[in-house]
Amino acid sequence: MEILIFLTIIFILSSVNLSTQYLSNYKNLEFNKNDHLGSSYIWSNHSKFAGLTIFFGDSVIKGFFPVFLSKYILNINNEYIFLYILIIQMIGNNWSIFLKLKGGRGMAIAIGSLLGINFVLALILYGSYLILYFSKFKDGGITWIISLTITAFISIGFSLNVLYCYLACIFLTILKRVTGNQFKFDINIIINRIIYDRDFR
């Protein structure tokens, strides 16, 4: 029962979209709910400082803190608790109940959550992303998927539970990209969304 209550709180917290709160309450601006409303959207279209602040909120408060809380403070005794937390976090963030099942991409919240789950693998994930981004792709969409996949393979040597977390993250990331905030049944668009996280290359 305690786990169910804890996961419900995480789901509600993850569903709070900090970008829309910033736009509607602080800036009093209209926004298109079909956009991927995350920290990168605010960074690119409004304010670098606000984008970083929202990224911190998504990755640390919404992502890392619930995992840290379950591991070191609540001492929840469940073999798959990290997997449950990650899945709930990404579902809440990507398909927010406060935005009619629309939301962000889930990258920031996954960054924080995976750091809490396994520090070493998270560093490998971040390192892979930075190396691939700056040396090869210069594109965050394809770089993120490849980095997650590389780290998932490496995680096999650590723990099956951690592997499941990375596989769940990959699946939910691809699912969000395919469906977007407005699904389009076009094979070229779907492929571009999976690889590049946008409708057109």
What is each stretch, according to the model?
Residues 122-124, 139-147, 156-171:
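Loop-to-transmembrane alpha-helix initiation sites
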Residues 1-7, 63-84, 115-121, 154-165:
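Helix-coil boundary and interhelical linker segments in multi-pass alpha-helical membrane proteins
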Residues 22-52, 182-201:
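Cytosolic, membrane-interface loops and tails of multi-pass inner-membrane proteins
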